[in-house]
Amino acid sequence: MNLSQLHVLVVGGATGGAATALLLARAGARVTLLEKVAQPRAVGAGIGLAENGLAVLESIGLGPAIAAHGRAVDSPAIVDGRSRLMLAPPRPTPRVRMIRRSDLQGLLLDALAAEPRVERQFGAEVIGAERDGRVTARVDGRTVEHRADLVVGADGVHSRIRTAGDFGARVRPPGIAYLRALVDVEAAQGVEAWTGAGIFGSFAVDGGTYFFASAGTRACRHAIAARDLEALRAVWARAYPPSIPLLGAVRRFDDLIFNRVIRVDCQRWVDGRLALLGDAAHAMSPNLGQGANSALVDAAVLLDELRRAADLASGLDAYQRRRRPAVQRVARAAGSMGALAEITNPVARWLRDRLLLPVAARFGGDAAAVVMQELPATLLAIGRA
């Protein structure tokens, strides 16, 4: 398919949407990017870029910048609350780079600004869409109508494109929540700890440490409801002593980011000229670190299948047939991993640690291949073609 004849409207300017806009524009498409945030700003905490996501970003020329801003995760093991090894990563260890989410977004925004075939419209909130490619947005109090050959909904868990189309979506919270923060101390353990209070992970980023912690125990919930930072520190000091310098470096309760996990599963990713990508199509538990990485893979595969196809409809059908089963496998695995990690009952934890984790260790290499979804070399080649 000749992409130079294609006008694509990408809704959502975060990681998946920005990468989609760049990939399609560099392949010849004319792209309009709508982002509801009027002024892009530093948001979020940290993000782990796995080998599949890194390959996509490297294919659009961001490899050197990510290497400069990110920090390699050498051996992302799982330990217990006393820092004893529970599960080592598979060998060879897949590449992972941890980066501040704001740094990654800044790199993508700069790349978009330098791409002449991308028109960026910030402060554009989508309020409606039709399967024939018509999209209605609100900009500065005005209603603006758009029409495109293809509309890509990369607008996240609460996607307006998904609600406008017929995707057979199921949206549900699995009952898991996390706290995240960036602190300017270098006290990262470089591991994920499965403790009596849930998960605590900490990894080095440029100029500090990114950490995340479960927020599901009764003591954690009470501390969060009361906005009591000292009580939260005490919960984690008992469960995992290496958390002490990290939570101690949090100056205000509002410096913590609180996220409830929401799962999204769609029976279809395509409805006419509307197509979903990233969390809009398949938001998952974060326990395998594949949320944003899967969105990047979506972007590359969408480009690949459109280029291969004779027409738009067949390209979109091939995209969803190639991506949906692979993402579903990863989402199920992430949900299972999250459920295992959040076990707080001592007897159930003992059984998990003695019976389930040794079995998981035996199949680590096979599991890593499933998580990657596509060969990194394939993804790299798609963007460079």
Regions found by a protein language model. Name each.
Residues N2-V8, A25, A50-G165, A169-E186, ...:
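Conserved N-terminal helical subregion
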Residues A223-D255, L312-A313, R321, V371:
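Flavin-binding catalytic cores
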Residues L9-R26, R30, L34-V37, G153, ...:
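Conserved mid-domain beta->alpha element of the FAD-binding
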Residues G128, G201, C266:
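Short, surface-exposed charged micro-motifs
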Residues M1-L6, L288, D304-A385:
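C-terminal helical "tail/cap" subdomain of flavin- and related membrane-associated enzymes
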Residues I60, E115, Y240, F253, ...:
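Acidic-histidine catalytic/liganding microenvironments
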